[in-house]
Amino acid sequence: MSIHLGAKGEDIAPRVLLPGDPLRARFVAERFFHNAYCYNEVRGMLGFTGTYKGVRVSVQGTGMGLPSHSIYVTELFQDYGVQKAIRVGTAGGLQEEVALKSVVCALGAATDSAINARRFSGMHFAPTASWSLLRTAVSVADEMGTGVQVGNVISSDVFYDESGSWRLWARYGVLAVEMETAELYTLAAKFRREALSILTISDHLVTGAVTSAQERERSFTQMIEIALEAIIQ
């Protein structure tokens, strides 16, 4: 057991999907896993393990934002020996060509958070995806006929941002805004693990378009299928 996860060491698989929403973790387990069981209910942050196409895979909710994500990812890497982690979540589109409901694989992640500034004593670290996972996910998506867009995202500390700072990030070609990827990639680098963030565009800051609950579920399912196929390779 770790401080925030009530699992025994063998309860968590070496491959883990990371939705922010613990209810999405349950959805993944019920929809895609065979013989799924719940290994964590601490703080309501549900975690499940099962098999997908004969391979053991876990799914663990992480909450919203870099600090919460950091806690769970650190414990998964440090205390449970997780080797591959794929974040699956939603993001806001920052480019017109990144359509609503499309899937984005985050190549790199900028951030307005002070976490890395503190961690690296004011110096700047470039958090990037694991090439092997990224390449596999893109290949899987192409084979599925889905296709993904690959590029940088911005991991922000602020959800209700009235400053309009997203326009600056958009000017530099950043595809989407979300709240966790920069920390996932930084921790993967620290622990020498593989990590990738696969995101569904649920709303669009440029066009103002938003998805319905039903549309989010369908597009989320597509993203999960890509993530599962990639992580078992």
From Swiss-Prot:
Any GO BP: purine nucleoside catabolic process
Record function comment: Catalyzes the reversible phosphorolytic breakdown of the N-glycosidic bond in the beta-(deoxy)ribonucleoside molecules, with the formation of the corresponding free purine bases and pentose-1-phosphate.
Site feature: Important for catalytic activity: R216
Protein name: Purine nucleoside phosphorylase DeoD-type
Family classification: Belongs to the PNP/UDP phosphorylase family.
Lineage: Bacteria, Pseudomonadati, Spirochaetota, Spirochaetia, Spirochaetales
Entry annotated with the keyword Transferase: yes
One Pfam assignment: PNP_UDP_1
Name of encoding gene: deoD
Gene Ontology CC entries for this record: cytosol
Subunit and interaction comment: Homohexamer; trimer of homodimers.
Keyword Glycoprotein: no
Stored Gene3D superfamilies: Nucleoside phosphorylase domain
Catalytic activity: a purine D-ribonucleoside + phosphate = a purine nucleobase + alpha-D-ribose 1-phosphate; a purine 2'-deoxy-D-ribonucleoside + phosphate = a purine nucleobase + 2-deoxy-alpha-D-ribose 1-phosphate
Alphabetized CDD domains for the sequence: PNP_EcPNPI-like
Residues holding phosphate: G20, R24, R43, R87, V88, G89, T90
